[in-house]
Amino acid sequence: MAEDDMCSLFFKLKVEDVTCSDDPEKHMKNASNERKPLIEPVENQLMDIDDEGGSVDHGLLYLYVDCRTMMCCFHRGSLPYNWMQGALLTNLPPYQHDVTLDEVNRGLKQALGFFGYADPMRTPYFTAFSFPGRVIKLNEQMELTSTKGKCLKFDLYASTHLRFKPDELVRHGECKFAIG
């Protein structure tokens, strides 16, 4: 019962002006559009990336966990240790309508080797982050089967730096995967 109360608070949670998304697709696209001027150079503008070591922006990355873990992340300002080498994130958007939550759990369990993702209630919530230059793109990908039988591939990213800055948190909310 206490967890239900805590999860209802999750939807009212506001972290550094970031509120829960009731329409993740619209909010993710808006967030991406808001960030474009920050990461794309203006025409004829020179950029000196050598000083930064060639920082790469991977776009929005998503973390899928249960409500209690998500609340702890926000409270502590750190990512959960959900992988043997730190935190694992993906570019699978939480509004992917042709993938079921069970299939996402299967893909995460396979990618992470983490038994907790066998329970579909482990990933109904997402947090979207923007980590330019702070994550490593892994060689392997998460392979999912769509509701139409099509093979879909999503990139996986790792972060050993688990603390996050408030401005790296873009959105959070409940996933809108296909029901199946």
From Swiss-Prot:
Transmembrane feature ranges: none
Enzyme kind, highest EC tier: hydrolase
Keyword terms of this UniProt record: Cytokinin biosynthesis, Glycosidase, Hydrolase
InterPro entries linked to this entry: Glyco_hydro_41 (IPR006065), Glycosidase (IPR006064)
EC number: 3.2.1.-
Summary of the function given for this chain in its UniProt record: Hydrolyzes cytokinin glucosides thus liberating free cytokinins.
Listed name of the protein: Cytokinin-beta-glucosidase 2
Organism: Linaria vulgaris (Toadflax)
Source organism phylogeny: Eukaryota, Viridiplantae, Streptophyta, Embryophyta, Tracheophyta
